[in-house]
Amino acid sequence: MNPRDLLPGVPLIESPFFERLAEQAWPDPELRRIAADLHRDGFAVIDFPEEHFDAIAEAIRTKLEAQFDIDDWRRHGAGSLRVQDAWKQHEEVRHLAAHPRILDMLSALYGRRAWPFQTLNFPVGTQQPAHTDAVHFSSVPERFMCGVWIALEDIHEDSGPLEYYPGSHKWPMYGNDQLGLCAADHGGPMGQGVYEPLWRELVQLHGLSAKRFMARQGQALIWTANLLHGGAAQNDRAHTRWSQVTHYYFDDCAWYTPMGSDPMYGNVLFREPVDIATGATRRNTYQGREIAIDRVGRAFQREATRPQRSLWNCVNGLLHRRFD
């Protein structure tokens, strides 16, 4: 039997049948190399496939520079500087995010059509603690999400380079239920800080060491949904670290925020993402059925005014709702 038919709800690069799939799914040697890296390590490095990349990178840096007070950050700032969804104002950001060759590549790697839903642009290092995107952006079926980090300039070792933990993507996707948490008790998402002690202990348990991506301008790193990654400390604030991250979802899924969800309690913090390539809001689906968000309910937006219900009543209500 075709392995694709056995597990259609698992990304091809995450499939336990990867070795049987590889040659047929990716006849191109370079694409097969990228797939193998993602399967083994949870990330893959590529040269961004854009002929005019240098000019586009310069345009992004020039247009976004005025939005940041980098001098003040150098004197007083902690953490990082960022702008989210600059694709709405700047075509160059949108062009990189929705690049047809990237979309085709990701679609071939995952086995479903990819589309971009969020961009983040940084002039300096993020200095962000190690985390997985899966607690922020998840899907059902799980793992149909990835990120593409792009170097908009050569990255210096003291500029707070991207860090990642190879192989961490193979860990289970831990959520509120495994941590003994109920988001409803907190009135919404709790923040990734509640997960960070677990991630630190898992790193020690598995003996993993952080690797740094000393990228040159035009290189990109694809990471899978559950890869542990973050930003190293920026040791020299004289350096910039211009970069762009685009987050991607895939067709035929439901998309939600696990940190703010208690699915078995009837609370799912669904996302209503916009496809950057088309500008259209994408609808959540489950096994081909569109999920009506007004029926399922957005977590916490109605919780404050909703009468308290038992766990059984919540689950029973969900079981008898129509999702088509």
Name each model feature, range by range.
Residues 121, 132-134, 150-154, 166:
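Short, structured patches in soluble enzyme cores that scaffold and shape functional sites
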Residues 112, 124-127, 155-157, 220, ...:
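Short, charged/polar surface micro-motifs in flexible loops or helix N-caps
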Residues 124, 165-173, 247-253:
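Short edge-strand/loop segments of extracellular domains
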Residues 133-145, 208-209, 215, 239-241:
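A short beta-loop-beta micro-motif enriched in histidine and acidic residues
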Residues 2-16, 20-24, 70, 178-180, ...:
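Non-heme Fe(II)/2-oxoglutarate
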Residues 140-157, 214-217, 222, 247-251:
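Short, conserved beta-strand element in jelly-roll/cupin
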Residues 1-132, 136-141:
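Non-heme Fe(II)-dependent double-stranded beta-helix
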